[in-house]
Amino acid sequence: MTTHYIAGNWQAGQGETLQSLNPVTQAVIWQGQGADASQVDTAVQAARQAFPAWAQLSLEARIDVLEKFAAQLKVHAEAMAQCIGEETGKPLWESATEVTSMINKVAISVQSYRERTGEKSGPLADATAVLRHKPHGVVAVFGPYNFPGHLPNGHIVPALLAGNCVVFKPSELTPKVAELTVNCWIAAGLPAGVLNLVQGARETGVALAANPGIDGLFFTGSSRTGNLLHQQFAGRPDKILALEMGGNNPLVVDEVKDLDAAVYTIVQSAFISAGQRCTCARRLLVPQGAWGDALIARLVEVCKTITVGAFDEQPAPFMGSVISLQAARALLAAQVELAAKGGVKLLEMTQPQADAALLTPGIVDVTAVADRPDEEFFGPLLQVIRYGDFDAAIDEANNTQYGLAAGLLSDSRARYQYFWLRSRAGIVNWNKQLTGAASSAPFGGVGASGNHRASAYYAADYCAYPVASLETASLALPATLTPGVTL
């Protein structure tokens, strides 16, 4: 089966056998062999050969290809949404919004490039100061499974726009979405070698990250893998490394007037995408006392009614499945571990079908757990922590190695300003779900959550590097020579 797109040609893999399964039915929806190290190297060489011509194209010519790609996505939007839903398990309504985000990424990236990079100049007494930006060359893009179209797209589009060539390794759990995306690029007229697709799991990823022919690597995914990449790139300052990773995100709740609005925002923060967004709330900080008790009781009551089902089920469920049976089992095991440490299951997460990766929402009160794990439980598992005063809540919110997203639900602007100033996170929201983000804003965090602001408006910053120049059209002696020099 032809699973890799290298130098403008589809070819079969020579590495390990791979399968992609529908996470609910376990039906095989894609199969092939991963790329081995030699195929990865061929892909890198193809990108290197294509780089000079692609980089020398005018910006408008590259924009034209990107806009044709967006047009192809529109043509194939329904098929793309179906593919995303089938492979990830997310409901069709959510898959459709992902395709829309992919389409919109082109215009956002063009605007970002013009405003944050591009070319600027200013006159000096005897020359012109010019600032231009140059592409790095060949970059690797590693994509995640939770948004297999949108998140890799957030690296690939700005990278190509800046003049780079790309070797793309998607998650081994979502190869079909990657294949369909690359076909849209081919139909858009992208020249051979500018974008190369290598499918595979760990073996392929290690080979690509270690290949000396890449000039950088752009990664969105787990902190564990990102940390390994960071260690691997240590001592390689000549390589650009952009990491967007996960978070153990806190959502602090103040005593607000509208209890149901708070509950709805918590649900949208913790359980949308079956909890498989890197900005999902993992820790819910609730005040001690009667009001907090009422909030938790209402939250549990509402979460019991959340519908969970297959991606194409009608009427549409709020939550689809998690990515795989393995992921579902790991989350159930995490719930057991929290309970063993002293956590109280306020709402037990369950697996309605043993052979399907469907999970119901789980809520565990871990206030009494002394050694709470600072981990990202990537699914519908929410930990509740009760707090006595606002400063204690902020301290607990910051009690993590991560720093991706944090939020406050409060009727007080002064409290929010106090919270914002003390929060250690790259995204801080007020009375909005943690999973909400504007495409025109930077997306990313601090600490173990990453470095650059990947996959958003600020992606232009790491897709090209600035070059400062002093320029004049003719060479001439200055009117006054430097002391000590005679001509």
From Swiss-Prot:
Q: Entry's InterPro entries?
A: Ald_DH/histidinol_DH, Ald_DH_C, Ald_DH_CS_CYS, Ald_DH_CS_GLU, Ald_DH_N, Aldehyde_DH_dom, SuccinylGlu_semiald_DH_AstD
Q: Where does NAD(+) bind?
A: 221-226
Q: Does the keyword Transferase apply?
A: no
- Under Enzyme Commission nomenclature, its number is 1.2.1.71
**A single GO molecular function term of this UniProt record:** succinylglutamate-semialdehyde dehydrogenase activity
Q: Name one Pfam family in it.
A: Aldedh
The biological pathway it contributes to is: Amino-acid degradation; L-arginine degradation via AST pathway; L-glutamate and succinate from L-arginine: step 4/5
- Catalytic reaction(s) noted: N-succinyl-L-glutamate 5-semialdehyde + NAD(+) + H2O = N-succinyl-L-glutamate + NADH + 2 H(+)
Give GO terms for biological process: arginine catabolic process to glutamate; arginine catabolic process to succinate
SUPFAM superfamilies, alphabetized: ALDH-like (SSF53720)
Keyword terms, alphabetized? Arginine metabolism, NAD, Oxidoreductase
Active-site residues from the entry: 244, 278
Q: Which Gene3D superfamilies match?
A: Aldehyde Dehydrogenase, Chain A, domain 1, Aldehyde Dehydrogenase, Chain A, domain 2
Top enzyme category: oxidoreductase
Role description: Catalyzes the NAD-dependent reduction of succinylglutamate semialdehyde into succinylglutamate.
Matches recorded under PANTHER family: ALDEHYDE DEHYDROGENASE-RELATED
Family membership noted in the UniProt record: Belongs to the aldehyde dehydrogenase family. AstD subfamily.
Its name, as the record gives it, is N-succinylglutamate 5-semialdehyde dehydrogenase
What organism does this protein naturally occur in? Pseudomonas putida (strain ATCC 700007 / DSM 6899 / JCM 31910 / BCRC 17059 / LMG 24140 / F1)
The gene coding this protein: astD
